[in-house]
Amino acid sequence: MRKSVVVALLVAMVATSCRVLLVPDPPGPRSHDGFLPSWYWEARQSSYLDYASTQFSAGSPTNLIANAEHSRRTGAPFNTAGITMADYANSFSRMDNFVDTADFDLTYIMNLWYGYRDLLPADVRAGIESHMRSFKYWFTDPQPTGTIDQRYYWSENHRLLFHADEYLAGQAFPNDVFSSDGNTGAWHKARAHDFIDRWLTEKTKYGFTEWHSDVYYQKTFDALLTVVEWVDDPALAQRASMLLDLLLFDMALNVQKGNFGATHGRSYMKDKSKATDEDVFNLNKLLFDDTSLPYDNTGDPGASLMARAQKYHVPAVILRVAQSKHTTVDQEHMGVALDAGAPVDHTQTGIDGYSFTDPQNVEFWWERGAQTAWQTVPLTLDTLDSTGLWESDFYKPFKAIADITGGDRVAAQNLAQALEPMLGFALLTAVDTYTYRSDSVMLSTAQAYRPGKFGEQAHISQATLDENAIVFVTHPKNEPQSGTQWPDDDGYWTGSGSLPRAAQHGALSMSLYAPVFASPGPPLTAFRYLDYTHAYFPQERFDEVTQSGSWTFGRKGDGYVALYSWRPTHWRTYTDPAIFTHGLTQPFDLVADGGADNVWLTQVGDAQKFGNFAAFRAAVLANPVNVAPRPVAGGLPGGFDTSYTSPTEGTVAFGTTGSLMVKGVETPLNTGKRFDNPWAVANVGAQQITIADTAGNLKLDFANVTRTASATRRHHRHGPKDGRPGGGNR
C-alpha cells in the first residue's frame, strides 16, 4: 500500500512539473538540511585558505583576508607588522584620482576592514577609514574642479560594487560628514539601500545582463557576497543570498571540469583560452571541486571572500548540479529586449516601466550598453552634458555624435539608428542561451544573438572538453597583436567584427556569418573587420586532432568535437616571436579565407554515445553538409541556408533568417523560460524558483523573501554529522 501511494505521488509530481527529477550522480556529501554540511564546506574553505596562506602579500587585501582567516581558524601567526601604508599607496591613489575600477579596490579593502580591522596597523586602518569617507560613490556626486572622473559606474558588476561600498561606509560612520559631498554616512547608507534594492529587483526579474561571464560573474559574486556578509538590513542580505544562489546555479549548469566554458555576454581572450585564465577559476574550484588542477592565485578575490564567508551557506543541490555526470540540456533567458535597430518611433517611451528619458533610469540603460541606442541617445547626451563626463576617456568618442548632429536630439537618434550595427557594439540585450553537457564534453551557444552586427566582447559559442581543450569561432577585427599577453582590446580573438546567427539543438551548433554592414573607413575605422573568419582549436591541448575534407576533429579523453567550415581552411603559422601565443607551439588558429561570410558547424559527442573516436568521425562524415549561399544584396553577403543530418539530432536546417527546423519541425530559439533544465523550470520574471533533484531542493520565494532548502533521506556519501536539524531557511 505504501509503495503504491509513493508511486502515485511521484506520477502526480511528474505530471505537474513535466519533468523527472534526476538522481544525483555522483551523490555528493550527505546533507541533513539541504545545505552543504559544515564538515564538508569547512574543508573546502580550508583547501583554499591553506593554499593562499603559503604567501603573504601585504598589498593584496584579498590575500590578507585569506591569511587573517587562516590565522583565526588555525592559530597560525599573522604578520601585522608586515603591513604598511606604502602597501596601499597605489590603491589610495587610484581612489583619490578617480581611476577606473577603484571600486574593486575599495570593495576588497572594505571586506578586510569589516572582518579584520583589529589586525591592521593604526595608520593603515586610519587611511582606509579616511578613504571610506572621501570616496566618490556615484557619478552624479560632485567632481573636484580640475579633475576628470575616469570611472565606469554603470555595468552590472560596477553598479552593485559601488552601492555595496557606499552602504558599508555609511553603516560604519553614520554620523560623520563625508568629504566627497558633505552628506552624512547615514544619508549615504539610505541612498545605497535604495540603489541596492533596485539592482536586486532588476536581477530577480531579468536575470544577469553580463550572461555567463567568466570575468564579471566574479565581480558580481564579490558584490553580492559583500552584501550578504556585512549589510545590516536582513531583507537586503536575504535577497542578495537568493540571487547569489541563482548566480552559482548558473555557473554550476555551465561548468565542465573546472572550465566555465559557456557562451559569455562579456569575455576577453586573456580570460577564455583556458580554465586557469578565467577570473572565476579559483572560485569554481573552491565551490565545485571538479578539476584536478591546483589553485593558482593566492589573492583571488572570489575564492578569498568565499573561503571566509560565515553567513552565506551553499545549497547542496547546486554542488550536485555542478558535479552531475548526466547528459543534460540547459536553456536560459536573461536580459531586456531592446531593439536598437528598429525604425525610430517617438511613440515608444520605455520598456516595462523603465522610461527612455528619466534620469533615474540612466544606470538601468547604461548597464545594458545602450548609450548609443536611438531610444536612449537623448538621455545619454543630456546626462553627459549635466555631469561633465564628456571629458572621460570612455565618453570622448561620443562627442562625435553630438558634433555631427549639432546637438539636435532627433538627428542624433536617426544617426544612431542608421549606424546601429556598429554603434551598438557594447549593447547587451536579451539573450537565450543553450548548453548541452555530458560527462565528457559541453557545447554552449547564444541563440541568434545580434546576428551580423559588431560585437565588442560577446562570445557566442564554445565547445569545452576539459580545462584546456576548447574550440570556438570568431570573425576577427584586426590581425594578431604583439605583446606579452592577450590585450584587453584584442579584436583578433575577443568579440567579433560581426556576430554570427547561431543556433544550437542538442549536441549540434550552427553559426552563420554574414555581416550586415560593410567594413568602414574613416571616421569609423574602429569598426573595421577582416575578410575571413577563424577558429581557436589548440592542437596540443587535445589527445588527437585530425582532418577530413571540411571537417576538423578533436579528442580529449572520452570527449569528441567536430568542426565544419564551408570555406576551405588552413592552419595559420606563427613565426614572429613578438606575437603572443600563450606558449602554444603547435597550430591553434584555423583560418577560413575568402570572405567574412561563412558557415561553421560544431558537433560534439563522447565515448558513451559513439564508442571510439573513429566511430564518431565516421558518424559525422556519414552525411554531407548542404550550404546554399543567398544572393548578394546591396553589396553585402546575403547569408546562407544550411542543413545537415546530425548523428545525434537528425536533420537540422537553419538560415541567416527563418526558423530552426529539427526533423522538419519548427523549433523555437526562445522557450520563454528563465530556466529550463532538469533541475529547474521557471518562467521569465518568476517570483518563485525551485531547484531540485531526488536528493533535495532549494526553494526561492522572492515575493516573500524566503530561502528554504531541504534534503530527502537517501543514501549519500557519508561524513561526520553536522548537528544541524533537518530543513533550512537561511
Q: Which ranges hold each PLM region?
A:
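Extended amphipathic alpha-helical segments with heptad-repeat/coiled-coil character used for oligomerization
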Residues: 225, 234-313
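Positively charged n-region of N-terminal signal peptides that target proteins for export
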Residues: 1-4
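Ser/Thr/Asn(+Pro)-rich, low-complexity disordered segments
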Residues: 13, 25-161, 174, 183-196, ...
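Charged/polar, low-hydrophobicity segments characteristic of intrinsically disordered regions
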Residues: 99-111, 139-154, 198-213, 246-274
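Internal, well-ordered domain-core segments that constitute the primary functional module
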Residues: 186-254
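Hydrophobic helical h-region of N-terminal Sec-dependent signal peptides
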Residues: 6-15
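Contiguous, well-ordered alpha-helical segments that form the cores/surfaces of helical PPI scaffolds
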Residues: 69, 107-111, 160-172, 218-230
